[in-house]
């Protein structure tokens, strides 16, 4: 067995105009595919550890040292992107009532949440991700990680993810990351967010 690159759940151009087809093609077929290939190459060196990336990245000390950083970077990259694709929707969706209530409880209002999430995504220096997670106490929390680090390694369960690596937006938005973040909120798959939230609580 090996880690497989998942197909996108929609066409490459399905998220236009927010996310253009060229970016989606490069992002999925090149960047994500490379993370998968590098992950498989690392796992082949240590077949004894298995292939459950969520379990491995939940406690990175259990990963053999010679492949640890490779798996943090590439295994994390695979998990992060596999989740990211599912969190995007070609059809505009309203926030589900359960998630809306949880966001109100945690942040005061949806606008306040959006502001804090945008700040986390804008403020991430260099490459990384912005996240809405369910923390160990079962509460919603906004966080960001560098590179391809995953909140799973901190015992948190991601329910919304935004890739802020330049390869995710530079062709369309150049260096204006805030415009990319604004576009992201127009294509969030809130049904998937709700599904993840219910499973994580």
Curated annotation (Swiss-Prot):
Subunit structure: Homodimer.
TM ranges: none
Organism expressing this protein natively: Streptococcus pyogenes serotype M1
Cellular compartments annotated: Secreted
PANTHER family assigned to the protein according to its UniProt record, in alphabetical order: 37S RIBOSOMAL PROTEIN S26, MITOCHONDRIAL, SMALL RIBOSOMAL SUBUNIT PROTEIN MS42
One Pfam entry name: Sod_Fe_C
Record protein name field: Superoxide dismutase [Mn]
Cofactor entry: Mn(2+)
Record key words, sorted: Manganese, Metal-binding, Oxidoreductase, Secreted
Family: Belongs to the iron/manganese superoxide dismutase family.
Major localisation: secreted
Secreted as UniProt keyword: yes
GO cellular component, one term: extracellular region
PROSITE patterns named among the record's database cross-references: SOD_MN
Catalytic activity from the UniProt record: 2 superoxide + 2 H(+) = H2O2 + O2
Entry superkingdom: Bacteria
Residues annotated as binding Mn(2+): 27, 81, 163, 167
Cofactor: how and how many bound: Binds 1 Mn(2+) ion per subunit.
The protein's Enzyme Commission number: 1.15.1.1
Role according to the record: Destroys superoxide anion radicals which are normally produced within the cells and which are toxic to biological systems.
Record GO terms (molecular function): metal ion binding; superoxide dismutase activity
């Amino acid at each position: 067995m090996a880690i497989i690159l998942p197909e996108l759940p929609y066409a490459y151009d399905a998220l236009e105009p927010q996310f253009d087809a060229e970016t989606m093609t490069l992002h999925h077929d090149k960047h994500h595919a490379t993370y998968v290939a590098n992950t498989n190459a690392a796992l082949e060196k240590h077949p004894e550890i298995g292939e459950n990336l969520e379990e491995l990245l939940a406690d990175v000390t259990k990963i053999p040292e010679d492949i640890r950083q490779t798996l943090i970077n590439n295994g994390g990259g695979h998990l992060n992107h596999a989740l990211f694709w599912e969190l995007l929707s070609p059809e505009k969706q309203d926030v589900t009532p359960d998630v809306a209530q949880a966001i109100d409880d945690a942040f005061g209002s949806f606008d306040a949440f959006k502001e804090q999430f945008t700040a986390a995504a804008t403020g991430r220096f260099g490459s990384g991700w912005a996240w809405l997670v369910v923390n160990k106490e079962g509460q919603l929390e906004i966080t960001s990680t560098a590179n391809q680090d995953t909140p799973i390694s901190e015992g948190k369960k991601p329910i919304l993810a935004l890739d802020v690596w330049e390869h995710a937006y530079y062709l369309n938005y150049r260096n204006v990351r805030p415009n990319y973040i604004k576009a992201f909120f127009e294509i969030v798959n809130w049904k998937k967010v709700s599904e993840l939230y219910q499973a994580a609580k």
